[in-house]
Amino acid sequence: MGRVAGIDEAGRGPMLGPMVVAIVVCPEEKVPLLRNMGVRDSKALSPRRRLLLSRAIPSVGCSVKVRVVEPQEIDCAVRGECYENLNHLEAAVFAQLINEVLSEGELEVVYMDSPDPVPSRFEERVRALLKGQVRIVAENGADEKYTIVGAASIVAKETRDEIINALKKTYGDFGSGYPSDPRTLRFAEEWVRKHGEPPPIARKEWATWKRLR
């Protein structure tokens, strides 16, 4: 049996902070160990359990790679300057991580959580950027269906949480960073009122920031 991989992102929708993409690569025979450990979609886990699992995933013989996508790069994609759109940016990051794994050896299959409601379209974007051959399974909700994608979602979410906690030490408690969070909105309003513009960690192309300017 060969190596299999799962890839997922965390933080696509917030108005503050980066998006994090993680890929977890395991020998196929190790995937049941992840399942037995309780690995599943990060959204179904408590913060404490997610932290413990993120540390345990490498201990069973799986490797992890992470890419942090900063707000400036996200804004550039949303404007259609660096990429066609945010999905195109995400496909490029997925492909970058898969190519890194392929450079280290053969990979049987990569399972990915598609941000595009048409997964085949997202798969084609990723495949066009690959430098080697690998079977791709792209599905909506893959983090709930495939243990290996659940592992990637855990690593991505935990990595992003660590970054957000560090940012809060600099900027203060801005809540979850999502536009639906009253604490985040209050932070945004107070920051713009005081500084006249969004903070450096803002995704300035988000509608909420445009409304506040």
Swiss-Prot record:
HAMAP family: RNase_HII_A (MF_00052_A). GO terms for cellular component: cytoplasm; ribonuclease H2 complex. It is found in: Cytoplasm. It is an enzyme of class 3 (hydrolase). One of its GO terms (biological process) is DNA replication, removal of RNA primer. Its cofactor is Mn(2+); Mg(2+). A divalent metal cation binds at D8, E9, D113. Belongs to the RNase HII family. CDD domains: RNase_HII_archaea_like. The keyword Manganese applies. It catalyses: Endonucleolytic cleavage to 5'-phosphomonoester. Its EC number is 3.1.26.4. This is Ribonuclease HII. Pfam families: RNase_HII. InterPro entries: RNase_H2_suA, RNase_HII/HIII, RNase_HII/HIII_dom, RNase_HII_arc, RNase_HII_hlx-loop-hlx_cap_dom, RNaseH-like_sf, RNaseH_sf. GO terms for molecular function: manganese ion binding; RNA binding; RNA-DNA hybrid ribonuclease activity. Endonuclease that specifically degrades the RNA of RNA-DNA hybrids. Residues 2-213 form the RNase H type-2 domain. Keywords: Cytoplasm, Endonuclease, Hydrolase, Manganese, Metal-binding, Nuclease. Manganese or magnesium. Binds 1 divalent metal ion per monomer in the absence of substrate. May bind a second metal ion after substrate binding. Its main location: cytoplasm.
